[in-house]
Amino acid sequence: MAGDESPTAAELRNQVRYLEAEVAALRRRLLEHPADGRSLESRLSETQASLASVTAQNERLAETLREAREKIIALKEEVDRLAQPPSGFGTFLGRNDDDTLDVFTGGRKLRVAASPSVDLDALKLGQELMLNEALNVVEACDFEVVGDVVMLKELLADGERALVIAQADEERVVRLASPLLDQALRAGDSLLLEPRSGYVYEKIPKSEVEELVLEEVPDIDYTQIGGLFGQIEQIRDAVEMPYLHKDLFLEHELKPPKGVLLYGPPGCGKTLIAKAVANSLAKKVAEKTGVEGRSFFLNIKGPELLNKYVGETERHIRLVFQRAREKASEGMPVIVFFDEMDSLFRTRGSGVSSDVENTIVPQLLSEIDGVEGLENVIVIGASNREDMIDPAILRPGRLDVKIKIERPDAEAARDIFSKYLTTTLPLHADDVNEFGGDRRECVNGMIQRTVERMYTEADENRFLEVTYANGDKEVLYFKDFNSGAMIQNIVDRAKKMAIKAFLDDNQKGLRVQHLLQACVDEFKENEDLPNTTNPDDWARISGKKGERIVYIRTLISGKQGTEPGRSIDTATNTGQYL
């Protein structure tokens, strides 16, 4: 151990021994010469102090040496670690009888040995492995998490390989990694491909169809829809009856309709009815069979289905109906709903800048005709320009049932108001007292007065004067352009007014004056919306059919009286469709 110490430490040790010997000598002299005791004790104290100082210095030096030794060891380990050759990675392809492994690394397929610390039985196809400088497996890693996204075209017969479509429609055969071997894969799924090894690792939840459809049925039923009693009865006869009474249809040799077209002006409940159909159908089937029922509502967003690349829109349509067939094959009723159907399936040859409808329409026709062999699929389309949809789609045998969703009349408006004005709302005490404290009668009275205000053919309700091609003129009132969406908006306006009144004057509750003022504000807000540049197109979308309209003049009552009408030649604000 002395050989490991520095010369300074040895000198200090010798000095300590020398001082200890001197102390012993002084003690002996003190015993021999008591008279010199005082001076000797003083020297003894000095010597002991020197001894303690040297001992402390020796301990500090020893601690410094220990720290230096630990730093040297740590630096040596760091140097050894940095000097190690780099480790490579490879993809596990298989295990051989002699426990060697087939690995794909560096663009080559190699057969390598494995370290005893690697559990060979736990290795899975496609797993990433760490290799040392001798290309031997030293550690098992996780699966690859990045790569290219490809679309599955079909699974091969062996169940371990698949045909996929990569970029630029390139077809490629790939291997399925272990995580995918037990998963249910179907054509159109997006998969993660590691292009060098040729393995697909996981299913990417990014199906193009899933971006365009809503599979789960919204929680909407017919009781939430007001003013459409006849239309609801028609669609129930067209959709629910064939599923609930299949035996009767077979007995009468009657085929269920393949599709339903809901058409009419905007904001009148076409989409709402379509959403309620699947929900009602699932409940009816559950009541009949006693089994928890479930139906699917594929809500196709028409404009988003369009794609600038040739053939992509048609492929999306095929995937939509493929999804519908899969769900229907499980015995579940499936409704494929095309909202704004005229945006996708226009009359062929009517395109201004493109002829995309020449291929989209035939694709839908072939899919609808293909639905004939399925029992649980029905197509529902909604449009406010049914005149622009290709006639081949509207013919019997495809969209068999056509239901017009009219603008609400006074009776329908009362029913719609009752969906939004309920007794649970905070009502003003003065209004309730007018009806003897009966909240139900108060609400009914509010609805009655509001409907009378909206549907009265008074000068204050005049909206437009239209001129037809034959020279006839007609005055249109706001009631002619009323809709369920407008009624909901009026109620919402009144509720906001009630909130502001409570914040300003501390008067809580909805009043009939709020509803009447909301009607005025709603009418005033819509006064600039009629498109006077193309009056006939505007009239068709607004639900005004018949003789062609060539001129529109607004008849809105302004603050100082009737504002001047606007002709199609001088109009500068084309506005939006009402």
From Swiss-Prot:
Pathway: Protein degradation; proteasomal Pup-dependent pathway
Family recorded in the similarity comment: Belongs to the AAA ATPase family.
Keyword annotations: ATP-binding, Chaperone, Coiled coil, Nucleotide-binding, Proteasome
SUBUNIT field: Homohexamer. Assembles into a hexameric ring structure that caps the 20S proteasome core. Strongly interacts with the prokaryotic ubiquitin-like protein Pup through a hydrophobic interface; the interacting region of ARC lies in its N-terminal coiled-coil domain. There is one Pup binding site per ARC hexamer ring. Upon ATP-binding, the C-terminus of ARC interacts with the alpha-rings of the proteasome core, possibly by binding to the intersubunit pockets.
Coiled-coil residue spans: 8-84
Entry GO MF terms: ATP binding; ATP hydrolysis activity
Protein name: Proteasome-associated ATPase
Keyword Cytoplasm recorded: no
GO CC annotations on file: proteasome complex
